[in-house]
Amino acid sequence: MSTEPEFEIPDDGRDSEAPTEQDDDAALDAYSQIVIRVAESVTPHVAAIEMTSARRNGQLRVGSGSAVVFTGDGYMLTNAHVVAGIQSGRAVFANGKQTDVELVGADPLSDLAVVRGLKPTPPPAILGNADSLRVGQLVIAVGNPLGLAGSVTAGVVSGLGRSIPVRAGEHRRVIEDVIQTDAALNPGNSGGALADTRGRIVGINTAIAGLGLGLAVPINRTTQRIIASLLKDGRVRRAYLGLVSTPIPLDASAVVRTGQKEGLRVVEVIAGSPAELSGLQPGDLVLRAQGRAVSSAESLQKLLFAEAIGEPFPLTVLRDGKTVQLIAVPSEMSQQ
């Protein structure tokens, strides 16, 4: 006759009463407590949005994504690609409340857009500053992937300063300082929140670049300007120079003479553009613009907002080993 094996459960020194809620809280590790706290704080401010837009063949296309309430009167941040061609839309919140939304403005070159709820919405989320993020820092993504409302994933900042090439009409640009994270993102997360451990929104989730790799547009001083322009004008006015460039390191002698380690090599100057009219030539090495050092396309783009349109735009370039001063007058970039 076989006998069942006997197992002795060691005494943990506590009585056998059922665990209390306080016991459960104490058992949670610090990581879980942070994620839970941020999820509970951020989720009410994030909406699932459904958008209806027209295809070229006249048929209607229904898309979905996420949006984040960021003002007390119902304005929400999302991605420009989520609301492209929108005819109508609806936002649904975690508490079950719904509202129709209207498009306020979109900027394809930053992949940011603003929509407004036509009925009362939950209070706004708190916006943070992505410039304070560090690689390895914990971040929490809240969105509506695959139609699953209020989904939360957590990960770390895998990289900072990444760039996403984007195109709007005939213009190409890069979204600068993009946040790379390993927090799981899926279709429907676009437009959702990326929050830090204090529940502040530091990014708007925008793309899935591959398995285990998500990207978010940062919330920082540059994007705050974009958001302000969308609220005010429904679009972002940008200045246009008309050049194609690539960053290169300076040789040792140039570093000594200029005090810079990098510059922008001009690859192409567009015919008839402000850059050509200024005298800029292919092969020139741009060192400074408006008196500020430039070492990447992003650093130059940051200077080309509406206030630069039609105004003198000083350029310092290195040409054949000599420093040359040029003055360009940027025009307004067309929206087409």
Predicted feature locations:
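Serine-dependent protease modules
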Residues: 2-262, 305, 321, 332-336
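A structural signal for short, hydrophobic beta-strand segments that form beta-sheets
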Residues: 103, 157, 266-269, 286
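Short, structured beta-strand/loop micro-motifs enriched in basic residues and often containing a Trp
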Residues: 119-124, 264-270, 293-297
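Residues at or immediately preceding the N-termini of alpha-helices
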Residues: 130, 220, 272-274, 297
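PDZ/PDZ-like domain micro-motif
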Residues: 190-193, 249-257, 270-288, 303
